[in-house]
Swiss-Prot record:
The lineage of its organism: Bacteria, Pseudomonadati, Pseudomonadota, Alphaproteobacteria, Hyphomicrobiales. Homohexamer. It comes from Rhodopseudomonas palustris (strain BisB18). The record marks H18 as: Transition state stabilizer. It catalyses: (R)-4'-phosphopantetheine + ATP + H(+) = 3'-dephospho-CoA + diphosphate. This is Phosphopantetheine adenylyltransferase. It is found in: Cytoplasm. Its cofactor is Mg(2+). InterPro entries: Cyt_trans-like, PPAT, Rossmann-like_a/b/a_fold. Its EC number is 2.7.7.3. PANTHER family: PHOSPHOPANTETHEINE ADENYLYLTRANSFERASE. One of its GO terms (biological process) is coenzyme A biosynthetic process. It is an enzyme of class 2 (transferase). Keywords: ATP-binding, Coenzyme A biosynthesis, Cytoplasm, Magnesium, Nucleotide-binding, Nucleotidyltransferase, Transferase.
Length: 165
């Protein structure tokens, strides 16, 4: 039975922190599905389509190099429901610090109650990417700062283009 993992997030934008988690997650599964959460009440910087393209461009080569099947999807319901919908038994969550752990443990507990067959796997972020958040990246880019140390080159280009107009 293939090990299918779901890695959910907003990916607005994709950061080197996300890339770090994906590079570790592909070693744990046969198929990785990155799921972009779409929330009607939120106004993301990048459209759903732009985020799908970013995720595919940045993560697919990493998965291919690890001989891990890769897919990208969107969801607008509970994350655990999205995991069940795609047949995932592993939910990948990246952790930067203790604050992330406290929050993610609560979510993992609730998810376990709703879907005991979906197991949360925490992947600690590498030291070099721990301070990176998509929110900070957006703020730096919006103010004209250089985000190249925090995001893949394709994403840096997309951010520069987005804020140039």
């Amino acid at each position: 039975m293939p090990r299918i993992a779901l890695y959910p997030g907003s990916f607005d934008p994709v950061t080197n922190g996300h890339l770090d988690v994906v590079s570790r997650a592909v070693a744990l599964c046969d198929r990785l599905i990155v799921a972009i959460g779409v929330h009607p009440g939120k106004k993301p910087l990048f459209s759903t389509q732009e985020r799908l393209e970013m995720v595919e461009t940045v993560f697919a080569p990493v998965a291919a190099a690890a001989h891990c099947a890769f897919d990208c999807t969107t969801y607008d319901n509970l994350t655990v429901t999205a995991a069940q919908r795609v047949g995932a038994t592993i939910m990948i969550r990246g952790l930067r610090d203790g604050t992330d752990l406290d929050y993610e443990m609560q979510i993992a507990g609730m998810n376990e109650t709703m879907a005991p067959d979906v197991h949360t796997v925490f992947i600690p972020a590498g030291v070099s990417v721990r301070p990176i958040t998509a929110t900070l990246v957006r703020q730096i880019a919006q103010m004209g700062g250089d985000v190249s140390a925090f995001v893949p080159p394709q994403v840096a280009h997309s951010l520069t283009t987005k804020f140039a107009g």
